[in-house]
Structure formats: C-alpha cells, structure tokens
Amino acid sequence: MDFAVITNNIGFLIFQGFFGLGNFTGGTLRLAVPAIILGFLLGVFIGIGRLARSRWIHLPATLYVEFFRGVPLVMVIFWFWFIIPVLLGKSLPEYSVALAAFVIFEAAYFGEIVRAGIQSVSRGQAEAATATGLRRAQTMRYVILPQALRNMIPSLLTQSIVLLKDTSLASIIGYVDLTKAAQIVNNREIRPFELYLFVAIIYWLCSYGMSTYARHLERRLAINPA
C-alpha cells in the first residue's frame, strides 16, 4: 500500500472532487447543497399538495411521490442524460443533468417528510388559528409550517445524508465529484484500494458528522418541545 497517492493528489480530490473548485464543473458539495435546498423547497409544495382537499392537487402530488419513490435514482439520472436532450434537441451539461435529476427525485422524499411533519401538528392549532380569523393559507404559513419544520428537522438531516452519499451516482455520466475524481486519479496511478478507501472515509466523516448533529437535535427538541 502506498498512501502517497492521496497526498500527491489531495488538491484534486478535495478541492475539485469534493468542493468543486477546480477546472472541471463538478464537486460533491456543489451538487449536494443546491439539490438539498431546491429539493426541499419543491418537497414543501408536494407535501402540502398531498394534504390538499382538492383531488386535482392531491392526486398529482400523490402520483409524483409514489412514482419517484418507486424507481431507482440511477434510472432518473439516465432519463435526464439520454432522453431529455433528445426531447429538447440539444445536449445538457453534466451538472445541469445531475442537479435536475437529484432535485426531482429527492423532492418526493422531502415531500413525504413535509407531509408527516404537518400531520404531526395538533389539529387544535389549525382550529384555533381559524377561530382568530386566519384563512387556510395563512394558517398553514404562520401557524402549521413553523411548528412542523421543528418536527421535520431530524428527518430532513437524515435524508440530506442519503442525498450526499447518493451524489456519487452522478459520476456515471462523467460528473467530476469525489468518486469520479478518485477514478480519474486511479486511471493514472492504479491505486484503487488507497483511493477508494480515502473516498469512503470522506463520505463516512460527512455522514457521521451530520447524523451526530441530527441525534443532538432530536434530544434537544425532545427536551424543549414547542
């Protein structure tokens, strides 16, 4: 074993592969952070749609969730990589394809978290808000969602961990994330054990840090309920 391959290529692996600060349009965090934010925002609308009284809103939101939770992420990535460019008549950059695929896919999971969070809020809260004269949309915005978000935080962090690890799948379309960066170095150095062990450690450190924070939040929220 020769771990000098790591130290000799640490700049490319970390700055390019993990942070996306190199010459390639890539980076694990550069993909994961926007995907988490945009996926959650879309998930809020989907989660609220799942609870809508109108079947014209509830049914499409339900079908969306059931469909994307029933197909593998890698298939969604391939759809955006091979099929969407054919429909548009032009090719798309790896980053756009990966980001769109992750946002669309993860929104289904974030939507279910939002739905469960909203349902965890006591019905009496909505009834009290209605009694004060608030409309349904105002009740959702000012009363239900703030309390629901508190209940969602641990689950949102857990799903974000899953998304962070899943970004390694973007390497199959040539997106230069941490996994792809290790593959590029390995093609030159032929040191798969050292390189992929390093990649695994980086993912583990990120996941462990986020999961530890999620457990801390769960304990804190349990001690200080809303």
Name each model-derived stretch.
Residues 1-226:
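Transmembrane alpha-helices and adjacent helix-loop boundaries
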